[in-house]
Curated annotation (Swiss-Prot):
Native species: Schizosaccharomyces pombe (strain 972 / ATCC 24843)
Family recorded in the similarity comment: Belongs to the mitochondrial carrier (TC 2.A.29) family. SLC25A38 subfamily.
Entry-linked InterPro entries: Hem25/SLC25A38 (IPR030847), Mit_carrier (IPR002067), Mitochondrial_sb/sol_carrier (IPR018108), Mt_carrier_dom_sf (IPR023395)
Recorded superkingdom: Eukaryota
Name of the featured protein: Mitochondrial glycine transporter
Role noted for this protein: Mitochondrial glycine transporter that imports glycine into the mitochondrial matrix. Plays an important role in providing glycine for the first enzymatic step in heme biosynthesis, the condensation of glycine with succinyl-CoA to produce 5-aminolevulinate (ALA) in the mitochondrial matrix.
Length: 296
């Protein structure tokens, strides 16, 4: 089904999937946090140009390092979330009936990726809500603790799961489509490399395999992110201003009425850029860590 499945046959322990996923999530979250913060600001109905937004954040919110605001909850979400996601995905692949039909195998990748992400997304929803509000300038949170206390005081436990429905509508399709296109791209790129480099097997050559992983990550990341961007924008609105955006349908109607179709594209470029690179880093580091056996 995939290289991940092959490593399982070679005896890769589940703990290695946890550690490799955490490593990939940590690297992607720390390096790309500025893009995540800017994407959140774009989606909270701000009409400033990107250069103007960056300049205002740097000049009025604490300098260049203010672009990394919200890094801690991002790290907590990405490291533990990616770790659990890869563990659960590997578990599903290990126990699910294996299909010899290529089309059925791709469909398995689609539903397994979506199901694993939805389950992990629910478990880490509180961290996601805290991260989004901490990145926004709509709230005057100075610490992570102050954001937790304020949400609990004003909204109770439900506040930490605000926007889960629209988040699931974003994450499950995105993850499913990502795994689907990732494995499909790897399969086709391996064939392409083999066709033009018959003397060197891509499957067994580390540099070629890494190139294939990176290219597959970029292709699948950009495709899945572009398709699911409207759900991400609605998720951000619901989590930032729940008193205005009540739920998925209400938010969609409100955005369309006030901003038209263009409103659903808020943060599109930044999200496609960040998610494409982020997913590529996470998956490439994950597979690299497993193959290089850097995780003992």
């Amino acid at each position: 089904m995939s290289e991940i499945k092959k490593t399982e046959k070679l005896g890769v322990k589940s703990s290695k999937h946890l550690a490799a996923g955490a490593l990939g999530g940590f690297i992607s979250s720390t390096t790309l946090q500025p893009l995540d913060l800017l994407k959140t600001r774009c989606q909270q109905s701000q009409r400033d140009s990107l250069p103007k937004m960056v300049r205002r954040i740097i000049l009025h919110e604490g300098g260049v390092f203010s672009l990394w605001k919200g890094t801690l909850p991002s790290i907590l979400r990405s490291t533990t979330g990616s770790s659990c996601y890869f563990y659960f995905l590997n578990w599903l692949r290990h126990f699910a009936p294996q299909s010899k039909n290529i089309a059925s195998s791709h469909i398995q990748n689609l539903w397994m990726g979506g199901f694993a992400r939805a389950a992990v997304g629910f478990a880490f929803m509180p961290v996601t809500v805290i991260k989004v509000r901490y990145e926004s300038n709509l709230y005057s949170y100075t610490t992570i603790y102050s954001s937790i206390r304020d949400i609990w005081k004003k909204e109770g436990i439900s506040g930490f799961f605000r926007g889960f429905g629209v988040t699931a509508l974003r994450d499950a399709p995105h993850a499913g489509l990502y795994v689907y296109f990732y494995e499909l791209s790897k399969q086709n790129l391996h064939k392409l490399f083999d066709r033009f480099s018959p003397s060197s097997s891509v499957q067994g050559t580390v540099p070629h395999r890494n190139i294939v992983n990176v290219m597959s990550g970029l292709i699948s990341g950009a495709t899945a992110t572009a398709i699911t961007n409207p759900f991400d924008m609605l998720k951000t609105r619901v989590q930032l201003e729940p008193h205005i955006y009540k739920n998925f349908l209400h938010s969609a109607k409100l955005v369309y009425a006030n901003e038209g179709f263009r409103g659903f594209l808020d943060g599109f470029f930044l999200r496609v850029l960040r998610k494409s690179i982020s997913s590529t880093i996470t998956w490439s580091v994950y597979e690299w860590a497993l193959h290089r056996k850097v995780i003992k």
